[in-house]
């Protein structure tokens, strides 16, 4: 049985063009993968606190075991909706808690949901995939910075990195 969970999500309706879940349903959970169980990160769009509680409960199976995590990266060095210069993200980067939290993005849609860095780091395999020269340069210099992506690169010997222009 295959269970799929998102590492992060924009706090938007699942039918929104901004929804990661919508993209996963359309592009991944089909053909041979159509029987996979996809756990949503947006269950209660009208109440963010209740939503976090619901997602924490439904993600307990991933907290126990995650086999594979795919991360992306933004031009600003953010990953998994953990952003530089965001108070909630800073708290997450300084925390050892395992769980699901809210953060704020610098651009719309602002409200995000993410798994903590410790939650992500527990994964058996972590792959970082990104495109573009600007992101490559951010990653290349990440060992000298305090960007969110820096933590994962410095602290995960099992991370595999794939890049294309």
Roles of regions detected by a PLM:
Residues 11, 45-48, 73-78, 84, ...:
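Short acidic/polar capping segments at secondary-structure boundaries
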Residues 71, 75-117:
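Class I SAM-dependent methyltransferase SAM-binding "motif I" and its flanking Rossmann-like core
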Residues 2-70:
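Ligand-binding beta-strand-loop-alpha-helix segment within the catalytic cores
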Residues 3, 64, 79-92, 111, ...:
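Active-site histidine-anchored catalytic micro-motif
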Residues 118, 122-165:
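ATP/nucleoside-binding phosphotransfer catalytic cores, i.e., glycine-rich phosphate-binding loops
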Residues 19-21, 80-88, 141-145:
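Short, glycine/charged-enriched secondary-structure capping and boundary segments
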Residues 60, 117-118:
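Short hydrophobic/charged patches on amphipathic alpha-helices used for structural packing
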